[in-house]
């Protein structure tokens, strides 16, 4: 009958409404398909797509923030190592060099060419039958070498005669080493095969100095400080290589720039330039046993004060470069964080 049919249709409508309601409760969506409400459905689709794009952009921006922060922390740590290297160089500068001793024997009375180095500078003089003349020739050669060298040996004579006038006395605020045993013996000093340093300059290497009547101080200490300095340079390079995030490192070398996009098309973006904060990138060279007057790399085991001062100047320049890089990274970080907050709104 008509009433029965009407009741059946009502039950079907109720069942359909219940199914729709249950579906909405299950999905949390009022509109589940274009059939429910075409306008709302496609508007929702567009908004979902926009939300997904923003989340992707925010992920990229967040990675950028973390990468910049890692680089900035790396620079801060490297700056501490540079300051420590400065401290070591200053310690070397304050370590005094001295060579002292009185010859055990009388100097040669025949004409003999004596070869020695003072702080790595080659010096030669000729002995004479007169000890006073020999001493004068030695001091003249030292004075001449001092004026032409890149490091001064100090004022005054370093060679003299003892109270008996028969033996040569050496008293220098410098590293004095003979180039061969014959030169050392010619001045009356006991020869030895043990060197006080491994200093090389202009192709000349000292070979004898340490003996019972001749001693040197400060060389070993400065060489040890030079090794500590070299170890710090290795740490600087390693630290720069470890300051990465998600495979991106902004301070281990140039050419590894990072581009952060702020919109879907990439038309709004920020390029963060990488820097080289390794030891070589900062212009810091390892200290070797050759001084700066040679073509070899290095600054002579910190033996010359002039070379140590050059190292300090290089460290100051490296510190300035790090400060500049940190300032640039800080500015970029501020921009990225600002855009991150904007994208979250």
Predicted regions span which residues?
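Primary detection of the long, small/polar-rich alpha-helical "axial" segments characteristic
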Residues: 1-345
């Amino acid at each position: 009958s008509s009433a029965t049919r009407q009741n059946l249709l009502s039950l079907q409508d109720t069942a359909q409404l219940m199914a729709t309601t249950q579906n909405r409760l299950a999905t949390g969506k009022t509109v589940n398909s274009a059939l429910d409400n075409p306008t709302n459905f496609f508007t929702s689709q567009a908004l979902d797509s926009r939300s997904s794009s923003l989340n992707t952009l925010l992920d990229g921006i967040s990675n950028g923030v973390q990468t910049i922060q890692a680089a900035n922390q790396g620079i801060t740590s490297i700056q501490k190592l540079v300051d420590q290297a400065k401290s070591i160089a200053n310690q070397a500068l304050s370590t005094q060099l001295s060579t002292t001793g009185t010859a055990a024997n009388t100097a040669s009375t025949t004409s003999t060419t004596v070869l020695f180095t003072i702080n790595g500078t080659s010096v030669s003089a000729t002995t004479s039958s007169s000890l006073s003349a020999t001493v004068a020739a030695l001091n003249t050669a030292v004075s001449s070498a001092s004026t032409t060298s890149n490091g001064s040996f100090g004022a005054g004579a370093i060679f003299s005669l003892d109270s008996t006038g028969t033996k040569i006395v050496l008293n220098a605020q410098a590293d004095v080493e003979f180039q061969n045993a014959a030169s050392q013996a010619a001045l009356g000093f006991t020869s030895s095969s043990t060197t006080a340093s491994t200093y090389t300059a202009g192709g000349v290497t000292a070979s004898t100095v340490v003996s019972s009547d001749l001693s040197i101080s400060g060389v070993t200490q400065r060489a040890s400080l030079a090794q500590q300095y070299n170890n710090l340079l290795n740490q600087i390079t390693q630290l720069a290589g470890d300051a990465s995030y998600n495979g991106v490192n902004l301070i281990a070398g140039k050419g590894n720039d990072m581009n952060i996009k702020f919109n879907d098309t990439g038309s709004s973006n920020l390029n963060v330039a990488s820097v080289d904060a390794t030891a070589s990138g900062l212009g810091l060279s390892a200290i070797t046993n050759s001084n700066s007057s040679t073509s070899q790399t290095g600054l002579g085991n910190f033996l010359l004060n002039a070379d140590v001062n050059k190292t300090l100047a290089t460290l100051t320049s490296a510190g300035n470069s790090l400060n500049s890089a940190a300032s640039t990274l800080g500015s970029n970080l501020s921009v990225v964080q600002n855009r991150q907050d904007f994208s979250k709104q």
